[in-house]
Amino acid sequence: MREVVAFGDIDYMNAVSVEIDAAFSRIIATSHQLATRADVLLDRVVIAEGIKVTGGQVTSDRDQSIQSSCSVTISDPLRVPVAADDILTPYGYELRLWRGVAVAGGQIMAPLGVFPIQRSSVDGVTLLSSITAQDRSKTVSDAIFEDTYQIAAGTNYATAIEALIEDGAPGFTFLFPSTTFTTPILTFGPDENRWAEVQRMARSIGNEIFFDGLGRCVMRPEPTFTSEPVGEIAEGSNMLGVVVDLDRGPAFNKVIATSSNSSLTAPVTGSATDNDPSSPSQYGPRFGRKARRFSSPFLTTVAQCNSAAAAILASNLGVARCINATIVTDPRREVSDVITVKREALGLDNELHIVDRMTLGLGATESMTATVRAQQVPS
């Protein structure tokens, strides 16, 4: 869940973040005035602030390699993207997007991401600029390995991942948890996708990795249904529409993780199984034995294999009760959030869900949609 930020000379400026967040929750629950803005960065430094955004959307999907992208319409006749040094062109410029509410003296807004511009165009009549951009993982992905890159055996995984990113796309801020896992000898050949390898390394120790609303590179444990919920979708509150879908396709009840590292002298494997007797997708006769195999050269110990298997199982556990909801726009929400869903007519009573996909509109009339997944269907 993203934290909101206060801009301008308003009463909330000296308040702690939890008070600002509470004020924001109260405001968006009633009629309010939309506030959006775009800042432009070059070489990780803000060079222009407060550019007017007239429409567009931000789309995020935790199952995609590049998690977030945006399409934005900007009304600023003095900044039309034509020449290479115009700041809305795809020559290294980035958009930092915000959405929130206007209040007396300023705005309270949440950061939606920092997006390197990929494509820009301008309408010659209206002078409206259209921008397409992707989050900063695109910059890492573009920086393929031009030569062989090697990580020494025994390197801490967090250290190795940060160095791997810095080698191709320097200057980012990293928010990584501590880990005791260390790497085997790892060699990456020319033209391999740097970001894809970073994600595989993070996944091998049970983590997800992405760029957050402020453009920081974040690594954290995969979300699970034991996590404390940070929000809700509820009738009579923020739910505008909902469709429920049940699909066993992406569901697995066992994950077997093995090492494919050729430097190991003996096979290394680990697993995680849905053994919960109350689970309708329990590994066994009723649901069936539906296992998924995962192999990675980054796995070198049984503990690491078990950790990776548990993280993958947590994201694929049980028949997914998938809910496609239209909700009151809340820019604090982000994919991987654990939330509750309440809709009495559908038998949903504060059921835990993980946000898998979401689209957030940037215009005053544009809504917010979210696809959320429950752990399992109650028996």
What are these regions (language model features)?
Residues 2, 6-10, 79-172, 374-379:
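Surface-exposed cap/loop segments at beta↔alpha junctions
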